[in-house]
Amino acid sequence: IVQPMSHTSLDQIRDTIISELEAAGRDDIKVVTENANNDTTALSTIMQNLRSEGVDIVVPIATNTAQSAKAAFEGEDTPIIFSAVSDPTAAGLTGSDCENITGVSNNIPSDEIVKLISNFQPGYKKIGFLYTSSETNSVSTINAAKAYCDENNIAYAEASISSLSELPTAVQTLLSEGVDALYTGNDNSIASAMPTYTDAAYSS
């Protein structure tokens, strides 16, 4: 089981997989857990090591982890069972070269989320979309939200980050553009730094 970093939802997925195996009485299965700690190079190394060790099944958590597993195990028939992947098709995890790959999507209906904004921010005029540019899952979610806004004449601004060090500045940039609400979709990097995100938003 491999996760790209630690935050509540990713940790919960890992722990639930392990507890369900235990509940099923599968104590014959050796479970190895790995965490790349938000390091892309480490993630690739972890996958290559698992391939060398000859694991029977790989369970990558989140989109970039699943993509890394696919690349590392190319040419192998090792089953890859992903979880927490927002858009498997956009992530390149479906198709003829993915016959050994399956899993569970955690896609968020972006239109419904945008509709909910008015529940806690009535009369808002402009949404600020913030996402990590390297996360396919996040880009896909935000693109769907922007499409809904375009169809419904909802104004928005957007900002992307390539590292968490850019997060406070990106938040301030959106606020300076007059947004009334901030929206981030399935974004593991930003989710792992939620206190930084909220502090930047509320400090204005």
Regions found by a protein language model. Give the residues of each.
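An alpha-beta-alpha
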Residues: 17, 103-152
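Short beta-strand elements in bilobed, periplasmic/extracellular small-molecule ligand-binding domains
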Residues: 18, 23-43, 100, 146-164
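Pocket-lining segment of extracytoplasmic ligand-binding domains
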Residues: 136-203
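Ser/Thr/Gly-rich flexible loops in soluble cytosolic domains mediating phosphotransfer, phosphorylation
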Residues: 82-110, 116
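Extracytoplasmic "Venus flytrap"
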Residues: 1-18, 24-26, 32-41, 134-138, ...
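Beta-alpha junction/loop-to-helix N-cap segments that form part of ligand/metal-binding clefts
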Residues: 33-95, 187-204
